[in-house]
């Protein structure tokens, strides 16, 4: 094979690689820390976050219940009413996935078992002894209240939620990141109800 043909192939390969890099970069989610000097318009922020219907959050969750403590890595995807929560790591039961919508929920574990129910709470209590409030989480993880349901809240110096009480849950937020230059989203959340406490650390957002 001639040197000219080899050089042409190399140039073509480099061109393809460059196109892929540019494509991936354009789809990447940008995240910057929210400084104490940044003050957001509360109404604009709320409506922007309310309209945000699709995202992926990755991180670690700590669970404290009945004098027990567990932790796991998670990947949480939301697309409208459809959701998927994958838990894996030191849970002691292998990986599990809970997915569903407003009508039904499926729980699948690493042993190949699949269980269904009308809501995530029922399945998770039966299988894990604790639960994630999926119906509220799709709002609370964005640091906004469920619309048209009674709540009390406090704001921080950035005009973002620092505390929220709703549906029997007490939720506190610390640390925010500005995602895609538009969405101030939390990176640390603590949720408590009765004898259950969830500590959620969000390491990355993708929207």
Curated annotation (Swiss-Prot):
A lipid is attached at residue 27 (N-palmitoyl cysteine). A lipid is attached at residue 27 (S-diacylglycerol cysteine). Pfam families: LolB. Its main location: membrane. Residues 1-26 form the signal peptide. Keywords: Cell outer membrane, Chaperone, Lipoprotein, Membrane, Palmitate, Protein transport, Signal, Transport. InterPro entries: LolA/LolB/LppX, OM_lipoprot_LolB. GO terms for cellular component: cell outer membrane. It is a lipid-anchor. It is found in: Cell outer membrane. Monomer. HAMAP family: LolB (MF_00233). This is Outer-membrane lipoprotein LolB.
């Amino acid at each position: 094979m001639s040197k000219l043909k080899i050089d042409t192939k190399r140039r073509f390969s480099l061109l393809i690689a460059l196109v892929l890099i540019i494509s991936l970069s354009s789809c990447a989610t940008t995240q910057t820390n929210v400084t104490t000097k940044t003050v957001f318009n509360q109404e604009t922020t709320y409506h922007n976050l309310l309209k945000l219907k699709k995202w992926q959050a990755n991180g670690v969750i700590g669970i404290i219940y009945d004098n027990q403590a567990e932790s796991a890595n998670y990947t949480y995807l939301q697309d409208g009413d459809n959701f998927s929560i994958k838990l894996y790591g030191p849970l002691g039961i292998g990986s599990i996935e809970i997915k569903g919508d407003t009508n039904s929920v499926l729980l699948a574990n690493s042993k190949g078992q699949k269980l269904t129910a009308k809501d995530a709470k029922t399945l998770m209590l039966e299988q894990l002894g604790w639960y994630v409030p999926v119906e509220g989480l799709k709002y609370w993880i964005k640091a906004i209240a469920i619309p048209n349901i009674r709540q009390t809240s406090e704001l921080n110096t950035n005009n973002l939620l620092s505390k929220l009480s709703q549906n029997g849950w007490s939720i506190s937020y610390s640390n925010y990141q500005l995602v895609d230059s538009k969405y101030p989203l939390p990176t640390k959340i603590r949720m408590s109800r009765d004898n259950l406490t969830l500590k959620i650390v969000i390491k990355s957002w993708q929207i």
